[in-house]
Amino acid sequence: MVKVFAFTFFSRQVRKCIPMATDQKFDNSFKLRYLKPKFWVNWFLLGVLGVLSFIPARVRDFFCNLVVGLLSSFTIKHKKLCLINLKACFPDLTLKERKCIYRDNLRVGLKVILGYGELFFRGDKFIEKSFMVTGREYLDEALATGRPIVFMAPHAWAIDRCGIYLSMIGLPMCTMMHSSGNEVYDWFMNSMRLRYGGKVYERNSGIKCIIRALKDGYHAYFLPDQDLGPKSAVFVPFFGKDKASLVVLPKIAALSNAIIVPFFACYNEERHCYEVVLEEYFRNYPSADLTADVRKMNAATEHLILGREKQYMWFLKYFKTNKPGETQIYGLRNPKVQKMYLED
């Protein structure tokens, strides 16, 4: 009865909260204009990634350990955003503790970035050996239901690399992307994402294209922690601080009969490989209570991050949408923000 009510409720709300789809898939074909001089720097950087992809991960990681301190002095804005987010989510941490997490976070990010070229330049056997999986039994359990799966994946440094794992093991995957504005970069990133097949939709295509793909037998990748503004969001606690949280996940589940599997992407610094973390799929989801469903999404996201803080992209503006009267915590030049978030 609850499922029938939820389906009816979400169906009535879909026109309000989910943009119409145009099925605008990313065009991954190579264009001659990509060879224009304005892209030469991009091609040089891709060449560097190509060379790095053939250097053992242990050697690359050792280099990252050496230069992370120097790099932190050139990433002032990212550092401040990271410290602000950590203060908002973990108010009991001292400034020294937050700076330590930031340094670890930057080191992990650098190791992942320098390994980007592997998905483009290395062979299948190499890629297969670069993964370890925690919780594979939860994936098998979800697949046994015969229903489409939405992998709920928070923003982690290794999110693209570990997302490839799902396609690599034979799952038909779809996801959405937001263009960076750099055609060569987008072509490179989506060439990696589509290495083992699947579909990548432009974000402006709307969520209905994902729902249609799920009904057609695909599985989807969903980022639950995005802040896309007050529209299609409710304010629900995230690590104790109210956040404008997306309401589309329970709607997708209701309209496509999909199940939700928490998914986290890690770079394992000890083993120099990528770790896919899977957890048990949501039971009785969605319910008739939209806010409770969004809270469950945030709670699952928190659980994935705790103990793996250095893997999470803390420099993103997860709390940029404020309630009326609230101070914008990302006002880096605001003395109140400086005192509250960037000092002990």
Task: Label each residue range with its predicted role.
Residues 18-153, 197, 341-344:
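Membrane-anchoring hydrophobic helices of lipid-metabolizing enzymes
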Residues 21-34, 100-103, 140-143, 168, ...:
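Non-catalytic C-terminal accessory region of glycerolipid acyltransferases
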Residues 47, 82-85, 188-189, 248, ...:
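Hydrophobic alpha-helical segments typical of transmembrane helices
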Residues 80, 179-183, 242-246:
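Active-site metal-coordination segments of metallo-dependent hydrolases
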Residues 145-204, 227, 231-234:
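Catalytic core of membrane glycerolipid acyltransferases/transacylases, capturing the structured
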